[in-house]
């Protein structure tokens, strides 16, 4: 039985992945991981992308146009389909994911942490970034988030888990991308992630490391520019992927996860899965 973790590092453009994440690239060089280019939906806005990642639907259908108007989505999604199939799910993410796929509005006391066997999110550990601004991005330590996901794997026995961190997206908005601060931030993230990724693999998980969207040189995303839309997709697992010159469709991620985990894809997810076995 395939167990899978989806790690989303928010707002990292393709070029920064390929030149600054030395541990990930080292695994690719050794043949222990595969990497492809993936393209975000339009608008390439954070909440719009989150909704598309798990429903397989474009924003023009799920109607999350921007980072406002967050609501419980009415469509089948990765969590709902896995839970129906008897899988145990986990989330260590921004609170938007809980609102989209479990309940809204987010109640910080009720929803900051929950264990609900009936799902759709069996084990949720969330953060809000309340008070976020240019001078203080209010992001939790990524080391702590990776540790929390690892605990869900080892103590709760999750079959599927998602981790989402806004650290690099928030820093990109503040410092832009062609600067020493962002070079170091990507380097630090790569080094922090690596030992956890090794441990997840030792525990029998396939792992995807990717982004929701990119950012351009001025720290912007939402539009059509290649830097705003394109990011890397690293896969640690046994399936094949399409040829390296084929850009992966973000809308295919949800049906690909379900297919890889042996769960039926709902008819609302119309993009063809890209895993080949």
Predicted regions mapped to residue ranges:
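Feature captures the catalytic ectodomains and active-site-proximal regions of enzymes
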Residues: 1-277
